[in-house]
Amino acid sequence: MQDEIGFDDIKLNYVTIAAARAMGGLRLVLGAYTIPGPWRESCKCLFDVKGIPYISVRCANAGATETSFGADGSHSELLAWTAQSSAPVAIWADERPRSTWIDQLNLAERLAPEPCLVPLDFDVRVHMFGLINEIAGEHGLGWNKRLFLIDQALKSAAPGSADHTFWSVLAEKYLYTAAMGLAAKARIIEILCKLDAELLRSRERGSRYFVGARLSALDIYSACFYALMEPLPPALCPMASSYRPAYRNADPDIEQAMGSALKDHRDFIYREHLRLPVVF
C-alpha cells in the first residue's frame, strides 16, 4: 500500500449520473472518492450484508471534479435526478430516489428480507430506530460532528482561503450557526455516552450486538459512524491521507466519552459482518 492515499485512489467502477439514469436495478449515488463518509458507508453496508448488487454512481456532474462537493453547481445533475444534492442516494428500478437513512434501510429490507436487520418485536424495533436516528439523523452524532468541525475550521481558516470556502459550503449544507457549533460538542458527548451505556447493557445480557443476539441495522450504523471518531487503520480503510486527521477526534472530553465499548463493537462488526478492507 502506498504511504500516501489520494482522494482519487478508488477501486469501484463509478458511472456517471446520466449513465445511471438509463440503467435498471439498484444504483447507489456514493461519490467517487476515498472518504468513509458514514452515511455512504452505512448505505453500502446495508446492501452488501444482504447480498444485493448495485451500481456505484458519481456525485458530480460529468466532467466536474468530485472535490468541489457540490460547489458552483457541480451537483446539478444529481439535483435534477433526486431533488437534492447529497450522497448517498439509493435508486431502485424506476422508483423514487431514496436519500434518507430510514428510506434506504426500508428499501434494503424489502428487496431482501433476509438477513433481517430490523427487529420483529415492536418495542425493540422502536428503540432501535430511535437510536439510529440519534446516530444518523439530522442533529444526530454525525450531524453534530460535522458542525463541531465546521465551527473549528471557520474560526481558524483565513476568509477567502480555499479551506474557508470548503467549510463554508459544508456550513450551508448543515445549517450551521455559531450557536449550533457551540452546542455540538455537548451533543456528541451525550450521544456517545448513551450508546456506550446501551452496549454495556447488551454485554450484561450476554450479547455483542446492540439489540437481541444478531446483527441489526443499529450495529451497522454505529460501526460506520465511529469512523468520525477514530477511522479504521489504513490497511483496513484506505481513506485519503489528507482527510484522516479531520476524522480523528482530538478533543479530550469527547475522547473520554468514546470509551472502549464502541470501538470494540466497531471492530467486531466489521470483522464478522462487513467488507474489509473498505473499498471505495
Regions found by a protein language model. Give the residues of each.
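GST-like domain detector, emphasizing the conserved glutathione-binding G-site
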Residues: M1-H164, H273-P277
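Amphipathic alpha-helical segments that form well-ordered structural scaffolds
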Residues: S42, L46, R187-E198, H265-I269
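Generic alpha-helical structural signal
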Residues: I102-L105, F129, I189-C193, K263
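Short His-centered aromatic/hydrophobic patch
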Residues: F225-L276
